[in-house]
């Protein structure tokens, strides 16, 4: 029998991406599947902290094995920003990916160093014990958006070793090499022990 795991997110893009990466290794449940309609606040100062806030909330309130993630884009020339604030970087714009990209590109105007990395932290709670997993992919921020697939900063992030952005690579390739894929692979390896 497959292990049931709740993925603590309301982000449909993340849910789809994680489901594709996990395949049939676990029975993945969404927050809707467990009738959780709470917007779990992400108030921690670190990616790991936000992931733990979400997974702890689900475990505490539903007593179900679960995991949550938080992802940040860390740009070297901006001292790691937007980091934990990546989804809401353009203040006052909510979770507006276009506004976030515009702000980031504006802040990088005239800067030579465009090195960046995407980092995902996953907090897993199994039988009340917490485990952390991390995935990192290095790359650079290009000057103009390219590509139509993916979400968030994908049109301006070009991973090391590729000429295409995440948005140009397409989901199949991205789901093999991304920061989230690397973190989920570690999660899968742990679950298969």
Swiss-Prot record:
GO cellular component: cytoplasm; cytosol
Binding residues annotated for substrate, in chain numbering: 9-14, 71, 151-154, 174, 179-180
Enzyme class: hydrolase
Reaction catalyzed: XTP + H2O = XMP + diphosphate + H(+); dITP + H2O = dIMP + diphosphate + H(+); ITP + H2O = IMP + diphosphate + H(+)
Cofactor or coenzyme needed: Mg(2+)
Function: Pyrophosphatase that catalyzes the hydrolysis of nucleoside triphosphates to their monophosphate derivatives, with a high preference for the non-canonical purine nucleotides XTP (xanthosine triphosphate), dITP (deoxyinosine triphosphate) and ITP. Seems to function as a house-cleaning enzyme that removes non-canonical purine nucleotides from the nucleotide pool, thus preventing their incorporation into DNA/RNA and avoiding chromosomal lesions.
Name recorded for this polypeptide: dITP/XTP pyrophosphatase
Highest classification ranks of the organism: Bacteria, Pseudomonadati, Bacteroidota, Bacteroidia, Bacteroidales
């Amino acid at each position: 029998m497959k292990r049931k795991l709740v993925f603590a997110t309301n982000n449909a893009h993340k849910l789809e991406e994680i489901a594709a990466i996990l395949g049939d290794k676990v029975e993945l449940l969404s927050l809707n599947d467990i009738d959780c309609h709470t917007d779990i606040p992400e108030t921690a100062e670190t990616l790991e902290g936000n992931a733990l806030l979400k997974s702890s909330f689900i475990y505490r309130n539903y007593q179900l094995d679960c995991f949550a993630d938080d992802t940040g884009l860390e740009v070297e020339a901006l001292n790691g920003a937007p980091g934990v604030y990546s989804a809401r970087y353009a203040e006052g714009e909510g979770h507006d990916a276009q506004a976030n990209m515009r702000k980031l590109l504006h802040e990088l105007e005239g800067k030579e160093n465009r090195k960046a990395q995407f980092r995902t932290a996953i907090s897993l709670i199994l039988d009340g014990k917490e485990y952390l997993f991390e995935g990192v992919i290095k790359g650079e921020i290009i000057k103009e958006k390219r590509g139509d697939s993916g979400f968030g900063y994908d049109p301006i992030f070009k991973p090391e070793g590729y000429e295409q952005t995440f948005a140009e690579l397409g989901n199949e390739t991205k789901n093999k090499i991304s920061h989230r894929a690397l973190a989920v692979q570690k999660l899968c390896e742990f679950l298969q022990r």
